[in-house]
Amino acid sequence: PMLLATSHIHHAFKRLKKRSQFGIIIESAEPREPHHFSLLFGYGASAINPYLVNEIITYQSKKAIITESPEKAISNYNKAIAKGIIKVMNKIGISTLHSYRGAQINEALGLSKKLIDKFFCNTPTRIEGIGLYEIEKEINKRHSKAYIHESKLGLPLEIGGDYRWRRDGEAHVVNPSTIATLQQAVRQNK
């Protein structure tokens, strides 16, 4: 939702011809990885405060889960994020954040044309998909998982499987079944 809001505000100011008069400061629990930050900057964010990451790092430092002081650990995290953003910018030949901000150099995958036209004006998309309704359903699902009923407190958090296959996690094309089929085909020389 933060990327939708950022881009929508960015384009609203552009339509009013007032974009250069305002900064868009993001304070959100969503951004965690360089890609998240890159998208937010690419769609108009001027600055980003990933408060939840900072709170988690501070908590882990105070509980001795990590060895650095909170300040040092947050500084290390910020350096890693900056390095990741610079890497993204370098791959497309942009050398300053000023040039990257609002450049919208991404292609959208899996979002409906209607959603793109409303929130991500002029962003190319060749593979259409979900709209605002499906995004709302996903947000509500995640919210209800995050704020579980008291009777379920103490149960472990779900692993998720965003990046690799997990039982009962996000669906992936590469999963144990496809790997087994591939291995069988290779063994049988098919």
Question: Where are the regions a protein language model picked out?
Answer:
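Active-site-adjacent beta->alpha loops and helix N-cap segments on the catalytic face
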Residues: 2-8, 56-66
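Alpha-helix-loop-beta-strand connector modules within alpha/beta enzyme cores
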Residues: 2-26, 76-83, 87
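Conserved, mostly hydrophobic/aromatic
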Residues: 9, 40, 96
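Hydrophobic faces of well-ordered beta-strands that scaffold small-molecule active sites
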Residues: 22-28, 41, 48-50, 98
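Active-site-proximal loop/turn and secondary-structure-junction residues that shape catalytic pockets
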Residues: 28-32, 54
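Catalytic cores of alpha/beta
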Residues: 31-44
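Flexible, glycine-rich loop/tail regions that form catalytic "lids" or insertion modules at the edges
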Residues: 36-37, 47-50, 62-190
